[in-house]
Amino acid sequence: KEQKPRSFWMANTPLPLDILFLNSDKKIIRIHHSAQPYSEKRFPSGKPAQYVVETNGGFCINHDIHEGMYVTF
């Protein structure tokens, strides 16, 4: 896969999510906190991203996860 600007939407999602965009180094480049369920708003990466990770809304704040951190998987 390649890095490119990406976006996410919540139109069919019934619960709030934290949306994390990661670059190819798995660095968090953008977090959208508690994205609203069923929203048709686009949530952009803002920069080229290779991955997106979804967690329950509030997870990032509750676990002190922020932009600039690295993820392993």
Set out the residue ranges of the language-model regions.
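Compact, glycine-rich, soluble single-domain proteins
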Residues: K1-F73
